[in-house]
């Protein structure tokens, strides 16, 4: 059946989120377990989409009173216009409406001029208000007007210059992406007794316009939407009530293999040597029978009793008609209940 192609792949659990002092800007997102190779596949795809395809806002042009072109200088302003433009490129902006929009800055020296002094409309936020734009000497003043727009990716300055641009308008390279940095790494992780699975660790930093967790969610949604066109078959129909899973005469947890329990190597090897494969095999053993197992001591016995107790089980239980026929097929069918 075609659905086995995806249904039989292991699915990761809900991602673990680790944040620092500022959860709105930095986070580490961990997804495990993944099939071997899927860590790199998903990590690389998410990284590329995060850096290139998320919508954001940026300054696209500026006008400074008394400045005709970007190679000018302003009296009483310590930075030249080129440096001011470089500082403006680093403004972090959030827009709650479609652009373009205008912002204005008026400042008088002496002192440092920061992004927090910019006058913005109600639908624009400056996310790094302490960012320095320029420094004014005593008696100096400056007035700037900024054009802000929304978009994605990187747009060079020449694309931001309108054909009817007035004299003195300086187009700016726009980096719209709210994501500043993405790094990922893949480590081996355990599933049962096997280490042949991937753990994906994503480290995401944004400018605050979107949280790292939301950014990853949006990137995943973009990938989902783009990949949808390649699904050219109809999904198998859901099973009818007559085809539904039969009721088991015992706890489905008994179908779980003992090598998936978090046991010490010594205990796991003793069970393996005694041909105990499923939990259903294990719980029918008495304590005396277990202690007769070669190399199996009281410490291993207590460990197993503690693990079983956590599942509501114990040694010496009676399970009629065990083992069932086609036990491996039953284990797959009731995998979600194990």
From Swiss-Prot:
Alphabetical keyword list: DNA-directed RNA polymerase, Nucleotidyltransferase, Transcription, Transferase
Sequence segments annotated as region (Alpha N-terminal domain (alpha-NTD)): 1-234
A GO MF label: protein dimerization activity
Record EC number: 2.7.7.6
GO cellular component, one term: cytoplasm
Region (Alpha C-terminal domain (alpha-CTD)): 250-338
Catalytic reaction equation(s): RNA(n) + a ribonucleoside 5'-triphosphate = RNA(n+1) + diphosphate
One GO process term, biological-process aspect: DNA-templated transcription
Family affiliation: Belongs to the RNA polymerase alpha chain family.
Role summary: DNA-dependent RNA polymerase catalyzes the transcription of DNA into RNA using the four ribonucleoside triphosphates as substrates.
Domain topic, free-text comment: The N-terminal domain is essential for RNAP assembly and basal transcription, whereas the C-terminal domain is involved in interaction with transcriptional regulators and with upstream promoter elements.
Self-association and partners: Homodimer. The RNAP catalytic core consists of 2 alpha, 1 beta, 1 beta' and 1 omega subunit. When a sigma factor is associated with the core the holoenzyme is formed, which can initiate transcription.
Name of protein: DNA-directed RNA polymerase subunit alpha
């Amino acid at each position: 059946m075609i659905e086995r192609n995806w249904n039989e792949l292991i699915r990761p659990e809900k991602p673990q989120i680790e944040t620092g002092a500022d959860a709105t800007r930095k986070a580490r997102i961990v997804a495990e377990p993944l099939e071997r190779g899927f860590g790199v596949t998903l990590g690389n795809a998410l990284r590329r989409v995060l850096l290139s395809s998320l919508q954001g806002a940026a300054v696209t042009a500026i006008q400074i009173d008394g400045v005709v072109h970007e190679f000018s200088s302003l009296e009483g302003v310590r930075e030249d216009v080129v440096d001011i433009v470089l500082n403006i490129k680093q403004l972090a902006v959030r827009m709650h409406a479609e652009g373009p929009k205008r912002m204005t800055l008026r400042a008088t020296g002496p002192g440092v001029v920061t992004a927090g002094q910019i006058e913005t409309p109600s639908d624009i936020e400056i996310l790094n208000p302490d960012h320095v734009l320029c420094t004014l000497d005593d008696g100096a003043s400056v007035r700037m007007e900024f054009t802000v727009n929304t978009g994605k990716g990187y747009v060079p300055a020449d694309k931001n210059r309108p054909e009817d641009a007035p004299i003195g308008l300086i187009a700016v390279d726009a980096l719209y992406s709210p994501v500043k940095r993405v790094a990922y790494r893949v480590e081996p992780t355990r599933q049962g007794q096997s280490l042949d699975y991937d753990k994906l660790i994503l480290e995401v930093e944004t400018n605050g316009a979107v949280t790292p967790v939301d950014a990853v969610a949006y990137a995943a949604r973009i990938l989902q939407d783009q990949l949808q066109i390649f699904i050219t078959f109809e999904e198998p129909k859901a099973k009818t009530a007559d085809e539904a899973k039969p009721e088991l005469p015992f706890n489905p947890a008994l179908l779980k293999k003992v090598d998936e329990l978090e046991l010490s190597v010594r205990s796991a090897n003793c069970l393996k040597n005694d041909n105990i494969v499923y939990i259903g095999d294990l719980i029918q053993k008495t304590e005396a029978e277990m202690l007769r197992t070669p190399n199996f001591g009281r410490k291993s016995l207590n460990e197993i009793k503690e693990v079983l107790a956590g599942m509501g089980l114990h040694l010496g239980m009676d399970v009629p008609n065990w083992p069932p026929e086609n036990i491996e097929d039953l284990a797959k069918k009731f995998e979600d209940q194990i």
